[in-house]
Structure formats: C-alpha cells, structure tokens
C-alpha cells in the first residue's frame, strides 16, 4: 500500500524531494496545488514529467470519502459523515458565521475518554486517525463548500473538538497542525487553531514544547472532583489540580488565553456554588470560559438548564472578571452540536 501524500508535512516533502534528486521547487509546487488550490488530481502545474511520474507511483492522493451530508435547516451548520478506507466512519462539522466557517475536526474513531455528557464516548475507541485522515476532513469540507455554497469557501478557524481526544493522538494531530500552519499549505494563522483536551497529561507534557502558539482548550465541566469524576472519568487518573498545574506552565503569546469549556447540566453542575468555585479556581489566570448548555443525545439522562439559570451562572462568573461566553447550540437539529457526534448513528 502506498503512503499517503497527505501524511507529509512540508519538511517531510522537502526531504523526499532531496533524497530523490528532484527539482527543489517540487515541494512548494505540490503543496500549493493540493493545499492552496485543493486540487484532487496529482499536480499538473509546473512539475517536471519525471517528478510527476515519481509522485504518482510513490504516493496515494485519495482522501476520506464523504458518505453523508446533513445540513441544519435552523442555522446552516453542515455535518459530514466520512467513510475511511477500513470502513470506519467519523464526523466533521462546519459551523457558519457571516458566510465564513469554523471547522470542527475529529482526531480518532470514537474516543477512550468515555465522558458521560458526550455521545462519542458511547462508541469507545476504535483507532487513531492518521494525519491524512485529519487533513482530509478539512480539504473535503472546503471542496464541498466550493461546490455547494460558492463564494463561502472560507474556513477561518480550525478546532479539534470533534470525535476523539486530540492529545491521545498527539503525533498525527501535531503534524496536521504543521500542515495547516505552513505558508506553503493552507496557511492558517496559529491563533486560528484550537486543540481541546479532557486533561490527558501525557499529551500536555509535550504540548508547549512541540506546538507553540496553538490555542488550547480544557474540558473542565466541574471544579468539584466528585462531579468531574462522573463527567470525565480520566479525572480519577489525572486530577484537575494536576492538569491545571501543567496548563499554568504553558507560555502564552500576548493576548492569548486558555479556553475552559463548561457543559451546564440541569440540577448537576449549574448552581451558584458551582459557579463560585469555578470562578475562584480560574480567577487571575489567562482564562476564557465557554458555557455550553447541555445538548441532548439518544440515551442520555442529562438535561439542559433553563436559560435563566445559565445567565445566572454567567453573572456569578462575571464577578470574578473572567471573560465568559454562553455558546449557542448550532446544528443540534442534526446532532452536530457539542457532545452530539457519534459516527455509529
């Protein structure tokens, strides 16, 4: 089986070009063709016949296949079900804002974290995604926009908040970020990429050393150990105080912050005491809080709190001077909102 072209970073591709004595411009031409122009066929642009033949013979240029597309009638969110070569499936979401998009990428088939508020966790972990399967979600979504919503094919933000724990698949996610950031590739700004984690410390140990500048988001969801243990079982192995200690060591750029995600669940973690404890925990940090009213999915016993309760929770956090946003549900009518992805359904 041929290796995938889309598993190569620009540095990897330069090494291949040099090892096979190809024209030094071949790496730039190929990246420009496949990532800036996002062409499907092997590069035909300014590439010598010998180089073209080499790459055709040496690499696989296929991408994950779009199996199904679900479009929200409420807010134009788009959810893709991708079929991989081994018949596993993953989901990816395009979230619209002002004719531009954020893309929510998956990093694994299923997830090992088993978070109780997340539909993906019910699948268990099947396997990690390759870099090409991660990058392929972006390229295929962009192509779909170009074909189906011409003039709107601007994906400005990349968030690793789909299926899987990104830091549990660190190497593939890291290389995907390198491709997205490359000036020869998609050239996404470093502040436009966010990687979310449940608090997987082995990945956090590598984070600041190997992915400087890329934004980090922590799925926090409760400042109380007992509640967080129920929501995020990995908290028993990697307690929140240890996770925060690692995060506090991450050097941040000017005006950069850590995002803390907080799913609000009715009569569970939505009280004033929860808010006060959360505020005290994060006060004085370079923190930004996303409050996410729970999005229901089949089989869950959790419920979403009333909007008044959500706003009261935010008001408590405001007293701690922590920037806080109540995130509206997008795509929940097609199970595309936060916590609703499940490629078995």
Q: Where do the protein language model's features map onto the residues?
A:
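Alpha-helix N-cap/helix-start and coil->helix boundary motif
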Residues: 10, 112, 200-202, 225, ...
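Conserved AdoMet/S-adenosylmethionine-binding subsite of the radical SAM
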Residues: 143-322
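Auxiliary Fe-S-binding modules of radical SAM enzymes
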Residues: 1-90, 150, 248-257, 262-345
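Short linear Ser/Thr-Pro motifs
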Residues: 72-73, 106-107, 196, 219
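P-loop NTP-binding catalytic core
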Residues: 86-95, 99-100
């Amino acid at each position: 089986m041929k290796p995938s072209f889309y598993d190569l970073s620009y540095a990897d591709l330069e090494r291949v070009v040099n090892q096979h004595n190809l024209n030094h411009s071949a790496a730039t031409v190929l990246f420009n063709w496949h990532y800036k122009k996002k062409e499907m066929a092997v590069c035909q642009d300014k590439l010598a016949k010998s180089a073209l033949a080499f790459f055709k013979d040496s690499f696989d240029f296929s991408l994950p296949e779009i199996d199904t597309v679900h479009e929200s009638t409420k807010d134009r969110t788009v959810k893709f079900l991708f079929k991989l070569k081994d018949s596993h499936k993953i989901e990816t979401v395009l979230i619209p804002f002002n004719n531009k998009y954020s893309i929510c990428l998956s990093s694994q088939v299923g997830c090992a974290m088993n978070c109780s508020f997340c539909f993906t966790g019910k699948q268990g972990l099947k396997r990690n995604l390759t870099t090409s399967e991660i990058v392929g979600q972006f390229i295929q979504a962009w192509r779909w926009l170009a074909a189906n919503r011409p003039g709107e094919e601007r994906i400005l933000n990349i968030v690793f908040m789909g299926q899987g724990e990104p830091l549990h698949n660190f190497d593939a996610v890291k290389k995907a970020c390198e491709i997205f950031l490359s000036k020869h590739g998609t050239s996404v700004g470093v502040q436009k990429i966010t990687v979310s984690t449940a608090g997987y410390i082995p990945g956090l140990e590598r984070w600041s050393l190997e992915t400087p500048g890329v934004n980090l988001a922590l799925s926090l969801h409760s400042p109380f150990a007992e509640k967080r243990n129920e929501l995020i079982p990995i908290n028993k192995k990697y307690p929140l105080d240890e996770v925060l200690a690692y995060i506090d060591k991450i050097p941040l750029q000017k005006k950069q912050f850590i995002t803390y995600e907080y799913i609000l669940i009715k009569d569970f973690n939505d009280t004033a005491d929860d808010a006060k404890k959360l505020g005290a925990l994060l006060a004085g940090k370079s923190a930004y809080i996303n409050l996410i009213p729970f999005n229901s999915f089949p089989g869950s016993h959790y419920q979403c709190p009333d909007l008044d309760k959500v706003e009261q929770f935010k008001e408590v956090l405001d007293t701690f001077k922590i920037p806080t946003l109540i995130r509206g549900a997008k795509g929940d009518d097609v199970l595309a909102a936060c916590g609703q992805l499940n490629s078995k359904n």
